[in-house]
């Protein structure tokens, strides 16, 4: 099982300081729909793991979130891709749950659901907490510089998990993965 987990806000869609609260505010990052399509066509299972504390803070509802995800699914399919599952944590930090990144609960659940190997699983995110969550299970962290990525690199570059790879965008990450898949494997 080849699994790639994507954070949502700042990776797939544009992030907002005041939370993405509605389908109208959910705007894809340029190239992200094509990136998911490329990963799908390269044989990867693509899942989304997203902290959505705006639900816990009562900024938007699960229904609003469902509408945003329906739009994301539709646009990804139009590009020729597939998102195989979406996991979200509705809690705030104060709830001290195990599913909110950087804790690994959501990531462990996704890896278990798809019967994947953690050591072979990528997580692409724009925040330190995304990278810490995949690192906690022994996976492969990738930082994109969209969303909060540039700020993460400048403020937390020294804290990034070892072996974190940095890409400008999700599209750049997908092209890297496709090149890796095309490279001849050593015996």
UniProtKB/Swiss-Prot annotation:
Binding sites annotated in the UniProt record for Zn(2+)? 89, 91, 97, 99
The terms under GO molecular function for this entry are: D-glycero-beta-D-manno-heptose 1,7-bisphosphate 7-phosphatase activity; magnesium ion binding; zinc ion binding
Name the chemical reaction catalysed here.
Answer: D-glycero-beta-D-manno-heptose 1,7-bisphosphate + H2O = D-glycero-beta-D-manno-heptose 1-phosphate + phosphate
Give the pathway listed in the UniProt entry for this protein.
Answer: Nucleotide-sugar biosynthesis; ADP-L-glycero-beta-D-manno-heptose biosynthesis; ADP-L-glycero-beta-D-manno-heptose from D-glycero-beta-D-manno-heptose 7-phosphate: step 2/4; Bacterial outer membrane biogenesis; LOS core biosynthesis
Q: Where in the cell is it found?
A: Cytoplasm
For site (Stabilizes the phosphoryl group), what residue positions does UniProt give?
50, 101
Q: Which InterPro entries match?
A: HAD-like_sf (IPR036412), HAD-SF_hydro_IIIA (IPR006549), HAD_sf (IPR023214), Heptose_bisP_phosphatase (IPR004446), Histidinol-phos (IPR006543)
The protein's UniProt keywords, in alphabetical order, are: Carbohydrate metabolism, Cytoplasm, Hydrolase, Magnesium, Metal-binding, Zinc
Q: Which residues of this protein are catalytic? A: 7 (nucleophile), 9 (proton donor)
> What EC numbers are recorded for this enzyme?
3.1.3.82
Which metal ions or organic cofactors does this protein require, according to UniProt?
A: Mg(2+); Zn(2+)
- Gene3D superfamilies (UniProt xref): HAD superfamily/HAD-like (3.40.50.1000)
Q: Which GO terms describe its biological process?
A: ADP-L-glycero-beta-D-manno-heptose biosynthetic process; carbohydrate metabolic process
Family matches, as Pfam families: Hydrolase
Binding-site positions, substrate: 7-9, 15-19, 50-53, 100-101
Tell me which residues bind Mg(2+). 7, 9, 126
**Site keyed Contributes to substrate recognition: positions:** 100
What are its GO cellular component terms? cytoplasm
Q: Spell out the family assignment given in the record's similarity comment.
A: Belongs to the GmhB family.
**Subunit details for this protein?**
Monomer.
Q: What is this protein called?
A: D-glycero-beta-D-manno-heptose-1,7-bisphosphate 7-phosphatase
């Amino acid at each position: 099982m080849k699994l790639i987990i994507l954070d949502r806000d700042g990776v797939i869609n544009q992030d907002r300081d005041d939370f993405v609260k509605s389908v109208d505010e959910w705007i894809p990052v340029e190239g992200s729909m094509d990136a998911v399509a490329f990963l799908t066509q390269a044989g990867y299972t693509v899942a989304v793991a997203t902290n959505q504390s705006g639900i816990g803070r009562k900024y938007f509802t699960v229904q609003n979130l469902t509408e945003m995800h329906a739009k994301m699914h539709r646009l990804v399919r139009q590009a020729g891709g597939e998102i195989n599952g979406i996991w979200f944590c509705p809690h705030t930090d104060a709830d001290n749950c195990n599913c909110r990144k950087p804790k690994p609960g959501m990531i462990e659940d996704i890896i278990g659901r798809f019967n994947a190997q953690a050591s072979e699983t990528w997580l692409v995110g724009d925040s330190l907490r995304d990278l810490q969550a995949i690192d906690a299970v022994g996976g492969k962290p990738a930082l994109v510089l969209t969303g909060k990525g540039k700020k993460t690199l400048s403020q937390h570059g020294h804290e990034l998990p070892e072996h974190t790879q940095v890409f400008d965008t999700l599209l750049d990450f997908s092209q890297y993965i496709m090149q890796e898949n095309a490279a001849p494997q050593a015996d």
